């Protein structure tokens, strides 16, 4: 039996000024699902990096679209970010991304690949497919125990 989920789809122009719309939509969806604040902030960075890669690399001179699909499951949020532009070898670049030498000055860090490193670090799972364009599937699991253990109950009871 297939796992039940809700799906939200969006398409926006692949322009930097529209990335905030995707980020805010994702934050609203994640908040509604019960994600912790820190996890939402992590996902905002990851989705921004995935979309910025498309804006910078996918369409060259042309303006294309970014397709975003949110899969809302009981225990996780799956985020698919896709384009139909020119692919670069994401997996090859990803394999070159590793721990950064913190003893080196920030000016010596590699310029390309930091976004991939961030996505990989901030999300629970990431899958990359490239054929005609690029598709990045990112997954973040809801840490309900953290909310239950760390959350302070709010009461309207007046104790004085």
Curated annotation (Swiss-Prot):
Q: Which SUPFAM superfamilies match?
A: ATPase domain of HSP90 chaperone/DNA topoisomerase II/histidine kinase (SSF55874)
Provide a Gene Ontology MF annotation, just one. Answer: sigma factor antagonist activity
User: Nucleotide-binding as a keyword?
Assistant: yes
Q: Can you tell me which residues the record assigns to a coiled coil? A: none
E.C. number, please?
2.7.11.1
Q: Which reaction does it catalyse?
A: L-seryl-[protein] + ATP = O-phospho-L-seryl-[protein] + ADP + H(+); L-threonyl-[protein] + ATP = O-phospho-L-threonyl-[protein] + ADP + H(+)
Q: Which UniProt keywords apply?
A: ATP-binding, Kinase, Nucleotide-binding, Serine/threonine-protein kinase, Transferase
Enzyme class per UniProt: transferase
Q: Which family does it belong to?
A: Belongs to the anti-sigma-factor family.
Q: What does this protein do?
A: Negative regulator of sigma-B activity. Phosphorylates and inactivates its specific antagonist protein, RsbV. Upon phosphorylation of RsbV, RsbW is released and binds to sigma-B, thereby blocking its ability to form an RNA polymerase holoenzyme (E-sigma-B).
What's the protein called, per UniProt?
A: Serine-protein kinase RsbW
